[in-house]
Regions:
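Sec-dependent signal peptide recognition
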Residues: 5-13
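Extracytoplasmic small-molecule ligand-binding "clamshell" domains
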Residues: 24-112
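Periplasmic-binding protein-like
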Residues: 41, 138-143, 214-261, 283-292
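Extended ligand-binding regions for polar small-molecule ligands
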Residues: 62-68, 148-151, 162-164, 241-280
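Ligand-binding cleft/hinge of the Venus flytrap
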Residues: 63, 67-72, 135-138, 156-159, ...
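Hydrophobic residues within well-ordered alpha-helices
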Residues: 65, 92, 144, 160, ...
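Acidic, polar ligand-binding/catalytic clefts
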Residues: 75-157
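A ligand-binding cleft/hinge motif common to bilobed small-molecule-binding domains
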Residues: 86, 109-123, 176-180, 203, ...
């Protein structure tokens, strides 16, 4: 999938220039016959390329959106910026700086009250006033996976004063574990620029544990078929335990946002979303906002 990235981006650019460069209303989308759907690149099991074909949980959900409008999905694979506000600006309301394209909808956006009310420190304006965030479709959380033979269970993070744990750099687990108990376990926190590299070392026994997103860990270690080999925690102590993920649409086109919200709600109630997750070997956690 990594080798496909440059080719993929070039082909996507060609497609982008053949369609509208603006985020659009439902009528505009139907008239064009295409909907531009933004997903994060190289991010299994959510969105990734496999043998030149887009795959993933968010890809399947995006197909549902496209099918509901009877249009073709155009995939806009995007990297993650320094923060979510930048991601939303570059994909939804301002557009990419290079090719100016705006996506009609973006997946995997935190549906979190604190974020929805977050303001820009310099302007005092809402960070997300240019987008509307609706359609929560799953709940995600940070967890730790261990090799059962080495660490059969975790009662305290202090165990990593003696055992090694891998993290992706600059993630919340990295910051939390590195600073735990004033650096007590810092020497055993192994940093990786790519999470897949941490997974590889974990599976090969080079490190004893990994910390990351539950869905991603379950998929990458094939936990469903290896429950005898690995132990998963329910959370990471003292880290925000759980949050919902949803979709973002330009606030100029709330009709599209409400349409997607209704579509996802129906798919949730029909267990279609749960089935998508299970097809990728991931245990589905329903959105907090739909279970309270």
């Amino acid at each position: 999938s990594i080798k496909m990235k440059p080719i993929l981006k070039l082909s996507l650019l060609a497609l982008f220039f053949s369609i509208s460069l603006l985020a659009r209303s439902i009528d505009d989308i139907k008239a064009s016959g295409e909907i531009v759907i933004a997903v994060y690149e190289d991010f299994p099991p959510y969105s990734f390329m496999e043998d030149g074909v887009p795959k993933g949980i968010d890809i399947e959900l995006g197909k549902k959106v496209a099918n509901s409008l009877n249009v073709k999905p155009i995939w806009y694979f995007t990297g993650s910026d320094e923060n979510l506000a930048d991601d939303l600006r570059n994909t939804i309301w301002r557009g990419n700086l290079v090719h100016k394209t705006k996506a009609d909808v973006m997946f995997r956006i935190p549906y979190d009250y604190d974020y929805l009310r977050m303001t820009n420190e310099s302007t005092g304006e809402l960070e997300n006033e240019m987008v509307t965030i609706k359609g929560p479709y799953q709940s995600e959380k940070w967890i730790i996976a261990t090799n059962k033979e080495i660490i059969p269970q975790i009662k305290t993070l202090a165990i990593f004063a003696y055992q090694t744990i891998g993290v992706e750099v600059d993630t919340l687990p990295d910051l939390h574990l590195s600073g735990f108990a004033r650096g007590l376990i810092q020497k055993n926190v192994k940093h990786y620029t790519k999470f897949q590299e941490a997974i590889n070392d974990f599976k090969n026994g080079k490190i004893d544990a990994i910390a990351g997103l539950k869905s991603q860990i379950e998929y990458l270690i094939d936990y469903k078929n290896n429950k005898d080999k690995y132990y998963l925690t329910q959370d990471i102590p003292q880290i925000k335990s759980q949050w919902d993920l949803a979709t973002a649409v330009s606030s100029n086109y709330r009709d599209l946002s409400y349409h997607i919200d209704g579509l996802i709600d129906t798919a949730y109630k029909n267990n279609e979303i749960k089935e998508i997750f299970e097809n990728f070997g991931v245990e589905y956690i329903a959105p907090i906002s739909k279970t309270q």
